[in-house]
Amino acid sequence: MTILFLTMVISYFGCMKAAPMKEANVRGQGSLAYPGVRTHGTLESVNGPKAGSRGLTSLADTFEHVIEELLDEDQKVRPNEENNKDADLYTSRVMLSSQVPLEPPLLFLLEEYKNYLDAANMSMRVRRHSDPARRGELSVCDSISEWVTAADKKTAVDMSGGTVTVLEKVPVSKGQLKQYFYETKCNPMGYTKEGCRGIDKRHWNSQCRTTQSYVRALTMDSKKRIGWRFIRIDTSCVCTLTIKRGR
């Protein structure tokens, strides 16, 4: 699935003359994650401000189309949920790179950029009103996200329930690249470590719990067989509730 994801991204973004995200010096030179998304200036600097505004609209439509295509392909390759109830989500949280990635995975950036375009089309007053921080919106559970290496993970659980060794480096034509995993988990130092935010403690027991999903990674099993397998990694922090008894 990772190869399919990269192929689709390259096909859509390889012909673009400008990348919409950030400056070129932000990304690592050895990254293989987004080979088609490179910044060589802004749309305004190439064709003027009017061309830039037209380009932003076109990019927004392209991003939406890419996301729809990715979701369609994800539904095709996802295994039978009746036989794999634990395989509830497949994500593109794996990157092969010579150095630590400086940005979240591409789909995270697409969502962030789409939100930016939506905000750019609002008036200043509406924009302030739509800001979650100004509306007092808070997450039920505090979470943290970061890139980790196979050296941090060591081992993982595959789809058959077996424990496999996560290989730190992946051989490529010009040498070796490290495997990086973008993990999201509950923040042990956050304000929700004693329970979920906004829950009535008189009637409910609550707990913020880290949940996992499957990603594809290069691993080695107990019989020393090396191959690409789906393994569990931390991908979200959710609130679990149990009702208090005896009241």
UniProtKB/Swiss-Prot annotation:
- Is Disulfide bond among this UniProt entry's keywords? yes
Q: Give a short account of what the protein does.
A: Important signaling molecule that activates signaling cascades downstream of NTRK2. During development, promotes the survival and differentiation of selected neuronal populations of the peripheral and central nervous systems. Participates in axonal growth, pathfinding and in the modulation of dendritic growth and morphology. Major regulator of synaptic transmission and plasticity at adult synapses in many regions of the CNS.
Query: Its Gene Ontology biological processes?
Result: cell surface receptor protein tyrosine kinase signaling pathway; modulation of chemical synaptic transmission; negative regulation of neuron apoptotic process; nerve development; nerve growth factor signaling pathway; neuron projection morphogenesis
Q: Which residues are glycosylated?
A: N121
Q: How is it modified after translation?
A: Mature BDNF is produced by proteolytic removal of the propeptide, catalyzed by a FURIN family member. In addition, the precursor form is proteolytically cleaved within the propeptide, but this is not an obligatory intermediate for the production of mature BDNF. Can be converted into mature BDNF by plasmin (PLG).
Q: What is the protein's given name?
A: Neurotrophic factor BDNF precursor form
What keywords are annotated for this sequence in UniProt? Cleavage on pair of basic residues, Disulfide bond, Glycoprotein, Growth factor, Secreted, Signal
Mind telling me which Gene3D superfamilies this protein's record contains?
Answer: Cystine-knot cytokines
Q: Which residues form the propeptide?
A: 19-128
Instruction: Please report which protein family the annotation says this sequence is part of.
Output: Belongs to the NGF-beta family.
Relate the assembly described in the record.
Answer: Monomers and homodimers. Binds to NTRK2/TRKB. Can form heterodimers with other neurotrophin family members, such as NTF3 and NTF4 (in vitro), but the physiological relevance of this is not clear. BDNF precursor form: interacts with the heterodimer formed by NGFR and SORCS2. Mature BDNF has much lower affinity for the heterodimer formed by NGFR and SORCS2.
Q: Any signal peptide, and if so, which residues?
A: 1-18
GO molecular-function term, one example from the UniProt record: growth factor activity
